[in-house]
Amino acid sequence: MIRRHFLTTALAGQSLAAQRNPSPGAGIFVEKAASGTPHRGKTLALVTPHLDDGPIFAAGTIAKLLKEGYTGYLIRTSNDEKDSFDLTLGETVLANERDTASMIAALGLKQAFDLGYRNHRMDDVAMIELRGRLIFLFRLLRIDTVFSYDPSGHYEENPDHYVTAQAVESACWMSGGKLDLPEHFAAGLKPHSVSEKYYFARGPQLVNRVVDIAPTLPSKLAAIHSCKTMVTHMVKDVNASLAERKLRLPALAGAGEDAIRQYTSLVFQQRDAAAGQRHGLAYAEEFHYIGPDRGLEEYISRNAVPL
């Protein structure tokens, strides 16, 4: 969806981003590129309501993990029918569906699953239904790592974001339960808990993990650029707002390919540069990360014996 005042925020010196982590470096793990493919055999899911959410907030990290051996999937929970500038609802759904195919190709994801809930109306969706569908996919795909909106994010205006986030959080846990949706097991699925979560947010967030995305920035920009209908909407919104003030930005004139690239660089690349600057990096993405409990595994590694 359209990011709240992204251009205004970028030109104002990233004032909102400064709120995300008031004490840079305190208790924050900086994740950098690993050599080889240490994650071969692992699977990740990007679970968002809107096509552009993942590219904007997490595509650099996802590209890094894919390069290191992960297989990745997109689970898009809404139909994105509201995100265009001058198309009808039906035209918008089709345009964003086509852009979805372009985005997963640009980022290197294996497949997209569209759940098809109506855009901006997900607070009308039964949580238990959405959670059940996610549990099915987490078990089917054997998801190890999830990227999604932070279920504890503050000041979130979009119901699609917080509804999806809350469903993801509970589904990650319940997908490992033997008594949760046991009919799945008759179809050949098995319990499977999601062990890692990378949560992002539009507003203030408890950031505890920063990922160096300088090596994968081109992949991120390509993923954002592939969301053509949505980014065109952003560009045309800015141009329309400026026209009301009798102003124009030559760099964004025409809202074509060049304008999309300029907007992507001006807003999203600069946003990641500001995040990187806070942590001594060229470009970075910030997350609240929840990983596996290492305590039991460490005990097992020290004390387990063969059967």
Stretches with model-predicted labels:
Residues 1-14:
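N-terminal secretory signal peptides and thylakoid transit peptides that target proteins
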Residues 17-18:
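Boundary at the C-terminal end of the N-terminal hydrophobic targeting segment
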Residues 50, 158-161, 227:
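Histidine-centered active-site/metal-ligand motif
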Residues 98-102, 165-166, 170, 218, ...:
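Residues on a specific face of well-ordered alpha-helices
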